[in-house]
């Protein structure tokens, strides 16, 4: 039982400390120089929209408020069967740089596939309708593409307003890891709020996968780097409702695991080296980490009385999960936003969402069509 417990303990540590450890090791390597250019390439900015009447005009205004040369920008807004006033609002804008596609409801991935066919420029920039971008963000993204080995550049998403302390801590750790991984190698994938990729690398997105993961890893699949630019900043709100957030995480986990399966070629360390290990650690092991955690918890409960060390570890785990439960019960109160409750609660929510996602995958459950997450 002792050997079993420590084996499981090692697996758990790998699931959750593996990526930060890889980031630390990667950060020790000599940084690879990226020659940036001031010659701006043409950008096609693509926004998939579903019932975005409250935000779409702001998205248009925010995009053209960028300091990027206006003649180098094309904005494609693709409506995925919107039933509100989104179409009317976009059509009211007569700017020739705007291309509006009023498509039937087929889901976000099909909408993006259709939009790319109308792209006039070589660099595709994907961003969400409810996300605001900093005036310098487009210039920051575009400047990296003077290097032939750079295929994709991810922006730096920052929460404003809503979102609990646990989620914020998660994003801070993720941002730190991306900075170190990007110095001399490649990050795992981009976040959908804002990222850019060469049009020549794009392939149609399959149904049922996370679009940002699939699109960005097309770069690594074709032996190009995925960089992170902390100065390409975008802003957006978190999701207040715990039920909505849990459902969103389940949906993302299901689509993310499907995406890894579709991109399983890049999980081969013989061909893709450390990137393959990095990808498996971040996108598979972390999402399924609840399995070894649950098994080792029951093993630990069986051997807790045999050693003060095991008893201490067992008590620590109980305390952690009790703090998570308290965070759940206080989630709509100010006290529930404290890190001591919010962080354990967020971690446990991610664990359970991974298990539920695995359940859906085993049963081949079809998730509902994409509906944007909104902070209402």
Segments and roles (model prediction):
Residues 62, 79-87, 104-106, 131:
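A conserved acidic beta->alpha catalytic loop
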Residues 54-58, 72, 83-92, 136:
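Acidic helix N-cap motif at the loop->helix transition within catalytic regions
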Residues 1-37:
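N-terminal membrane-anchoring/stem segments of glycan-assembly enzymes
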Residues 3, 37, 236, 286-366:
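Membrane-embedded multi-pass helical conduit in multi-pass membrane proteins
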Residues 124:
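Short aromatic/hydrophobic "clamp" motif used to bind/position activated sugar donors
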Residues 95, 145-154, 158-174, 207, ...:
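Catalytic donor/gating beta->alpha subdomain of glycosyltransferases that bind UDP-sugars
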């Amino acid at each position: 039982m002792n050997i079993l417990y420590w084996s499981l303990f090692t697996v758990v540590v790998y699931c959750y400390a593996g990526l930060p450890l890889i980031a630390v090791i990667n950060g020790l390597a000599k940084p690879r120089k990226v020659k940036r250019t001031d010659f701006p390439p043409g950008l096609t900015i693509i926004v998939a929209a579903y019932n975005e009447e409250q935000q779409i005009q702001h998205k248009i205004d925010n995009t053209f408020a960028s300091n990027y040369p206006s003649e180098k920008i094309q904005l494609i807004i693709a409506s995925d069967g919107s039933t509100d006033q989104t179409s009317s609002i976009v059509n009211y804008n007569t700017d020739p740089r705007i291309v509006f596609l009023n498509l039937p409801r087929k889901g976000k991935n099909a909408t993006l596939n259709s939009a790319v066919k109308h792209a006039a420029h070589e660099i595709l920039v994907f961003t969400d309708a409810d996300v605001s971008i900093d005036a310098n963000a487009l210039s920051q993204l575009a400047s990296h593409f003077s290097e032939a080995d750079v295929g994709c550049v991810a922006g730096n998403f920052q929460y404003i307003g809503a979102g609990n302390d646990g989620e914020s801590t998660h994003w801070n750790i993720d941002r730190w890891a991306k900075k170190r991984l990007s110095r001399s190698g490649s990050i795992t994938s981009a976040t959908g709020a804002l990222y850019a990729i060469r049009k020549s690398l794009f392939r149609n997105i399959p149904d049922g996968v996370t679009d940002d993961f699939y699109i960005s890893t097309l770069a690594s699949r074709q032996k190009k780097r995925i960089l992170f630019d902390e100065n390409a900043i975008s802003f957006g709100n978190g999701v207040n409702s715990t039920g909505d957030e849990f459902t969103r995480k389940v949906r993302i986990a299901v689509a993310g695991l499907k995406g890894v399966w579709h991109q399983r070629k890049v999980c081969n360390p013989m061909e893709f080296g450390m990137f393959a290990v990095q990808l498996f650690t971040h996108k598979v092991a972390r999402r399924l980490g609840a399995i070894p955690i649950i098994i080792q918890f029951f093993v630990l409960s069986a051997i807790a009385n045999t050693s003060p060390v095991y008893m201490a570890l067992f008590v620590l785990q109980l305390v952690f999960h009790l703090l998570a439960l308290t965070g759940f019960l206080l989630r709509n109160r100010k006290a529930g936003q404290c890190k001591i409750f919010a962080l354990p609660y967020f971690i446990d929510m991610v664990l359970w969402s991974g298990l539920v996602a695995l359940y859906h995958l085993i049963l081949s459950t079809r998730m509902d069509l994409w509906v944007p997450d909104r902070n209402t």
